[in-house]
């Protein structure tokens, strides 16, 4: 905050670790034949799926969100796997935290459902735009990128917007970094300039600004050389200076 930055927490509402204290309340979790399960349709064996039919779990979740806003003075949440959580919970939770007086809360949904905006999120991930951007670099007509941009904008409510990116924590781990996806430094910068200046809110994922080539794994340490490619870092700084001064 002293640096003029907002701080938002990554909020994982859909599931918890298997050693979470909530595990003492089995009814708070999705169960099959009496056994708590991991999220259906995934291979996420390291987490347990929460049961949003349980009113006590919902109440505890909302209370925890309020704690981080009030006690820790967080500015909002980036809500992980938002598409996996029911609309009515997001509406209930967001209505509750927005009722806190004197707070301007930032709410980002890691998802693509349009009803996230109805629930109260200001930002949705621009997944379609990202997919089309990669397609253009793989040889498809660039005109399709503008059509995708327009479609995303038309499906976004007034006063709300999409997060635009050339990578994020999932893509950098499971797909590739921008240096690989967009054919080197010039391509990575060109793709990023599109996400910055074509509309929406740009996401800069740590290490892309110094042109890291290897993927960033989820479950192991991956030191980043922050001194690499200073000219690339300078280009990102220039882009963001223009973006922030020309809303």
Kindly give the residue locations of the regions a language model identified.
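Hydrophobic beta-strand scaffold residues
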Residues: 4-7, 107, 202
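Conserved protein kinase catalytic core
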Residues: 16, 20-21, 86, 116, ...
């Amino acid at each position: 905050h002293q640096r003029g930055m907002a701080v938002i927490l990554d909020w994982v509402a859909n599931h918890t670790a298997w050693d979470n204290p909530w595990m003492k309340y089995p009814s708070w979790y999705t169960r099959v034949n009496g056994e708590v399960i991991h999220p259906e349709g995934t291979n996420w064996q390291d987490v347990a799926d929460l049961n949003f039919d349980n009113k006590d779990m919902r109440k505890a979740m909302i209370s925890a969100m309020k704690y981080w806003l009030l006690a820790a003075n967080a500015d909002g949440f980036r809500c992980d796997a938002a598409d996996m959580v029911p609309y009515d919970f997001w509406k209930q939770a967001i209505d509750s935290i927005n009722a806190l007086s004197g707070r301007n809360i930032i709410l980002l949904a890691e998802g693509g459902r349009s009803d996230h905006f109805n629930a109260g999120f200001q930002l949705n991930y621009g997944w379609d735009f990202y997919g089309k951007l990669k397609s253009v670099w793989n040889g498809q007509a660039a005109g399709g990128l503008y059509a995708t941009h327009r479609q995303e904008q038309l499906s976004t409510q007034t006063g709300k917007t999409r997060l635009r990116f050339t990578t994020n924590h999932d893509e950098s781990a499971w797909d590739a970094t921008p240096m690989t996806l967009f054919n080197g430094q010039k391509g990575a910068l060109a793709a990023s300039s599109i996400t910055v200046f074509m509309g929406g809110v740009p996401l800069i994922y740590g290490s892309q600004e110094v042109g890291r080539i290897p993927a960033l794994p989820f479950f192991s340490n991956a030191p980043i050389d922050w001194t690499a490619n200073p000219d690339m870092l300078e280009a990102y700084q220039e882009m963001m200076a223009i973006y922030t001064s020309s809303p």
